[in-house]
A protein has these predicted regions:
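Aromatic-lined carbohydrate-recognition surfaces of secreted/lumenal glycan-active proteins
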Residues: 334-344, 400-407, 428-465
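Catalytic domains of carbohydrate-active enzymes, especially glycoside hydrolases
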Residues: 271-296, 391-398, 479
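SH3/SH3-like beta-barrel superfamily modules
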Residues: 92-126, 165-200
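Boundary regions of SH3-family modules and the immediately adjacent low-complexity/disordered segments
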Residues: 56-66, 116-143, 189-244
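Substrate-binding cleft/loops of secretory-pathway carbohydrate-active enzymes
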Residues: 449-489
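SH3/SH3-like (including bacterial SH3b) beta-barrel domains
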Residues: 81-93, 153-166
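Active-site-adjacent "subsite" loops/lids of carbohydrate-active enzymes
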Residues: 247-266, 323, 337-389
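Aromatic-lined carbohydrate-binding/catalytic grooves of carbohydrate-active enzymes
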Residues: 281-316, 408-415
Length: 495
């Protein structure tokens, strides 16, 4: 085409474009604005500004955008913030997280990184509470005892060491695990002895450890109840709230209707009849004796170690007793193993050094039995070892401690003619409650519940002479059973 013709065609098209723009000016402007808005929207969704989008790509030598790590602190909970550094909530220390190294804000010389707790939850966390070292999750070097406890000498055994009192400072050596920020088990040092203590019994702040729990004035109710009958005062017991155990694979019936069976072979041989009968009623659980004083359920190896006499007089073999409990569980019933705690003549025969004694040092026969002292930790270890063996060997869902007390009827001996083997200077009620804490800790680790049988009297507004006090016991165990006997309601009106 000749040059003149091309110029004429170009001029014609330019004239047409100018005419189109004059006629559609607003439409063109709106279209351009929409395109700009779309570009900005895409940038916001992508988490970057237009300036960031045009930034050069990150090289391998630059800091990566994300790092894996853990929440660390001296406290159980750590705050996280909005981008404006307003507090938005808390997370438990020990949580595994991911944080962005190039999205942070700074205030007062402290940098806060955008931290992801899950796919959807995030917030800004102080650099002081982020670590890539799992051993650095727990920052405290000392803890203070809030609830008096005996240190465990070994994390994997039942042996107990020194009793550490409220407010005692313990040096932290290491720790194992956290649950909602609370340490499962500290390894600590105290007066040259190394041991272990649960994080639920200590505080990182001495003032908090020494404080008495009194929310809603609860403690004040007990503080005025002194030592009326020799069992101790209510003020010295522990009322700090404990979370009751709950196991996904072991549901406690609610309500629980149980039938009780002794461990006599003449009873257990008819287990099929009892199961068939239970199916016709509301019964959903069986209570079976592991031991009842000198009536021994089966020849557990625990008896061989702690009480050979009990082993010798076992009513059933392991296999015979095991078959009974298995039938109960196969039929869909909840299985509760009952054992007498501080009523045990066989043990006192084997270990008179741990028995409650008279003034001359001989084992004291009270209420048709000899009684191991509830003050003696070796007795605690024995009974909890037996309970754990019953859980592991027989498959019980719950352990029920009966005779979980000192003998009643000892008033005549209290004036210097009785030796309770009280090496720690505790009250009766303190030793009973502390035993149950120890038992619950170890049996909960085994995945079962713990219950206690008590006299109905212990619900009165005083600590009983034999060391039972309902509020202190019920604060620890998962279930509590008062024992109202039929003869309490006799026509004579004696009760």
């Amino acid at each position: 085409m000749p040059a003149t013709a091309k110029q004429k065609l170009r001029a014609k098209r330019l004239a047409q474009l100018k005419r189109f723009l004059r006629e559609h000016t607003w439409g063109v402007m709106i279209t351009v604005l929409i395109m700009i808005a779309l570009i900005l929207f895409v940038c916001v969704i992508a988490g970057a500004t237009p300036k960031e989008a045009s930034a050069p790509e990150t090289t391998q030598d630059e800091t990566p955008r994300y790092e894996s790590g853990f929440i660390c602190a001296i406290t159980t909970q750590v705050p996280y913030y909005t981008e404006e550094l307003s507090e938005a909530g808390t997370v438990a220390r020990g949580m595994q997280i991911t944080y962005s190294t190039d999205r942070s804000v700074e205030r007062d010389g402290v940098r806060y990184y955008l931290t992801y707790f899950s796919t959807l939850d995030c917030g800004y966390v102080s650099e002081e509470n982020l670590t890539q070292d799992p051993s650095a999750v727990i920052a405290e070097k000392v803890v203070y005892v809030r609830t008096p406890q005996n240190l465990r000498l070994d994390k994997n055994t039942l042996e107990l060491g020194t009793l550490v009192e409220k407010g005692t400072e313990l040096q932290v050596l290491s720790y194992e695990g956290t649950t909602d920020g609370v340490v499962d088990l500290y390894q600590v040092s105290y007066q040259g002895q190394t041991g272990y203590i649960s994080g639920q019994y200590v505080s990182t702040v001495q003032e908090e450890a020494n404080d008495v729990y009194d929310r809603f004035g609860v403690y004040a109710i007990h503080a005025g109840r002194g030592d009326k009958w020799g069992g101790g005062d209510a003020e010295s017991l522990d009322y700090f709230p404990r979370t009751k155990a709950s196991f996904a694979d072991n549901k406690m019936p609610n309500p629980c209707y149980a039938i009780y069976l002794t461990c006599d072979p003449a009873i257990l041989k008819d287990i099929d009849k009892y199961i068939e009968y239970a199916k016709t009623t509301k019964i959903n659980a069986f209570v079976v004796n592991i031991m009842d004083g000198t009536s021994i359920g089966y020849n557990s190896p625990v008896y061989e170690e702690y009480s050979p006499t009990a082993y010798q007089y076992a009513n059933n073999t392991v296999e015979e007793y095991q078959a009974v409990i298995q039938k109960i569980k196969d039929a869909g019933f909840y299985a509760i193993g009952r054992l007498t705690t501080f009523n045990d003549s066989f043990f006192c025969q084997d270990h008179p050094e741990y028995a409650i004694a008279d003034g001359s040092g001989d084992s004291l026969y009270v209420a048709a039995s000899y009684w191991p002292s509830a003050f003696c930790r070796y007795v605690w270890e024995y009974k909890v070892a037996l309970a754990i063996d019953a859980v592991q060997t027989m498959g019980f869902d719950e352990i029920q401690f009966d005779y979980m007390r000192f003998p009643d009827g000892t008033w005549a001996f209290e004036e210097g003619t009785i030796d309770y083997r009280n090496e720690n200077g505790e009250s009766k009620a303190q030793s009973v409650q502390r035993f149950l804490m120890y038992a619950c800790d170890r049996l909960h680790d085994a995945g079962v519940y713990v219950s206690a049988d008590v006299f109905g009297e212990c619900a009165e507004a005083y600590v009983t002479a034999y060391g039972q006090y309902w509020p202190a016991i019920s604060n620890v165990v998962d279930a509590i059973s008062a024992m109202p006997y039929p003869d309490h309601y006799g026509a004579s009106g004696d009760w």
